[in-house]
Amino acid sequence: MAMTKFIVRLLLLLGCATCSAAAEPLRVMSFNVRNSDARDGENAWPKRTEFFFTTIAAFVPDLIGFQEVLAVQHDALTARMTDYAFSGVARDDGHRKGEWSCIGYRKARFTKVAEGNFWLSETPDLIGSKSWDAALTRICSWVRLRETDTGKEFLYANTHFDHRGVIARQEASRVISTRLPQIAANLPALLTGDLNINEDNPAYAVLVKPTIPGAIRWVDSFREVHPIRGQDEASFNGFKGTTKGSRIDFIFHSAAFVATESAIDRTTRERRYPSDHYPVTAVLQWK
């Protein structure tokens, strides 16, 4: 009898430990870094690098999607963020030419299962491809991760839509809505990025109210936590501290998660900003 009670207690303890691990939330950030080639004077990359990294460290993300990363910045990320592994390639040549939409994930928590990239074009597998009215080549990078403690797997994708192409942005949403379900294969999924659109744009509707068969119905974490749309939701600041306006930077999740926190991080230091975009953050709980 004593042995039976011991086994029951042990099983209960193990079950509680598993539940505790499974309930650990995901801290997610999306951050457009502002590319280092831009002639930004006092806001140039070398003058804000330290502030940029301290801003990230303050949130302690488990997962982070970057946009506009050039080679010198990618080298800085990998050198400075040693607790993270990175996935993604530069968009122009699939190696180091052009901007990355790379992903960082905490090495102590996640193991990479698979990774890849596709281009937001009519030929998604063609490196450096560009279509429609897009001004620039655009890419979506993804990584399939396994949570070490629980064995849970999920897909995380990160992207940056074109800043000029109206048709290209809507078609980019369609490419993502077609490709990511194939890659996810019914796994839970996350999508972050600078989409260069607001919630009124048809490209946004393609993601959150999909009509494409099999598409993931993406949930906007910020709107989930803050259901009433406000006037001070700008996520682009132009190094001027702008707050009025709409978000163009997003953290989406599939139905496997629920957002318990979501914010636009408007950290400043002596009227300086870590980038011309505010980082956006979310805390996601497994359902």
Range-by-range predicted roles:
Residues 12-21:
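Hydrophobic h-region of N-terminal signal peptides that target proteins for export
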Residues 63-157:
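Structured beta-strand-rich core segments of catalytic domains in phosphoester-bond hydrolases
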Residues 31-33, 159-161, 194-195, 278:
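Active-site metal-binding loops of divalent metal-dependent hydrolases
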Residues 109, 144, 167, 171, ...:
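Metal-dependent phosphoester-hydrolase catalytic domains
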